[in-house]
Amino acid sequence: VTDEAVGAHSDAAVHGSATTGLRVSGPDEAFLLAEEKLGFRTPIQFCWVLDDDPGLEAIERYAESLSTGLLHRAISRRRFPAARRRWVSSRVQPRIIVGARIDDAEIGAWADNLLRSADLRPAQGLGWRVHTTTTTRGRRVVVLLLSHLIADGEAIMRALVAAADGETTALADPDTARGARALAEDARDSARQIRSAARSVRAVARDARQRRRERREGTAPVVPNRPPSPPPTYDPYRATLAIVDVDRDLWHAQARQYGGTGNTLFTALVCGLVRRSGYPVGDQMRVSVAVSKRGGPEDLRANASGGIWLRVGEPQESPADLDYLRGLSRQAFAEYAKTGTD
C-alpha cells in the first residue's frame, strides 16, 4: 500500500458514522481520468435470476439499503490546484428501473443490452443503478449496474453484504468539502502532491540518465526486432459478451483433477479463449491477475487493488496440467509480496 493510499483512508471512521478526508487517489484517479479525458467508462454488472419472486417491494428495500452504504458516493469539485478530489456521499436518489416482462430465453440478451447501454455518471453521484423485470415463467431478474470508479470487486461484495445485513456506513456530507477548514486541508494536500510529483520527476530523470549511460557503454539490453502483428480480423471496438452457467462443484472438481485451483482453471480458460480467438499475443501472453490491498472495515477506499502479471508461454510449454500456471502464480505473488510493484 502506498503512502498516498494510506493517507486516503487513515482518517476514515468505522461502520455507522460519517467519514471525512477520504480522497480520490490511486486507481480511482486512473478510472476518473479515463472517463473525463478519454470517455472510457468501466461498468460492472451483477445479474441475479430468482426462481421465487420476492416482489418489487423487496428489490426497492434492498436498493434503499444500498443507498446508505459506500456505493452511494460522489466526487466533490477540486477547490485548490493539484489537490486530490474528495469522496462524499451522493445526494442522488437511488434509481430502480422496472422493465417489461421478458421471455426466459431473453434474459441474457436483456442483461447484455443493459450493460452496453449503461449511462452511469459516478463523479456526479449516479454511480450505480438497479434494473429489474420478471419472466414468462414467473422468475424475477435483478441487475445491478455500477461503475468501477466507485468500487472494486471486494468493495462491491462488502457493500452487498452490508446492505443485506442492514449496516450503514455514510461518507461525508458534500457540505464538508466546503468552508475554510476544507480549503486549508486541500492546500496541505496540494503541497503533498506537488512534492510527490517532484520526487517522481527526479526518479524519471535518474532512470533516463542510467539508460543513456548504458547505451554509451554498450551494456543496454538488446531488444530483438519482432515482425509486425497481423491486422485484427474482428472489430476491436465491440466487446463480445457471453453468459455461461457452470456448476460450482464440477468446476472445482475439474480444477483439482488437473492439479490446480478454481482460480488457475479460470486463468487457463481465459488463456485458451484468447489463443483460439486468433488475437495476436506474441511469444508470451501477458495475463493480469488482481490482488486486493484492502484492509479491514475501516478501509473505505473505492478501489484498493493491485495486480501481478503472468507471462504464459506457447501451449506446448503449458500442458493441461495446471501446475504450470500455479508455479507462475506462486513466483509472481512472491515477487509482489517483496516489491509491491503492480
Which residue stretches match the model-derived regions?
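Nucleic acid-processing catalytic cores of prokaryotic defense/repair systems
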Residues: A30-F31
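Soluble acyl-CoA-dependent acyltransferase catalytic core bearing the H(X)4D motif
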Residues: E4-L22, W48-L56, R61-T68, I75-D342
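Generic N-terminal amphipathic, Lys/Arg-enriched alpha-helix
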Residues: R41-F46
